[in-house]
């Protein structure tokens, strides 16, 4: 089974780096190869992921299932942050400073908010992701 994702070209991670098919490939292969328990059933049937261009990802499965469309949409690991993470269980991105963006941690995402600060057991403070693709234009 093949699922092809045609990505938008205006999506950026919260640190301003473009989201591309390389991130899709990296995420799916990282989760599959590391046998991350939460994603194991979703990624175990992924045979390969191809990226014919910057905004196209082709995900090949060893089985046929209507769940594959859901199983192919885990695009949450920015390759530029996670590529050197060997032990995902020990990685705490919210505690590590971002390598290029002052005041930001390595907890980088695609959503409308980013972590500003937190206190365990008390609060989490989020702020607007200025790189979010769906912000209203001025």
Regions found by a protein language model. Name each.
Residues 21-28, 43-46, 123:
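Extracytoplasmic/secreted envelope proteins and their assembly/folding machinery
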Residues 75-138:
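Gly/Pro-rich hinge or "lid" segments in bacterial periplasmic/extracellular proteins
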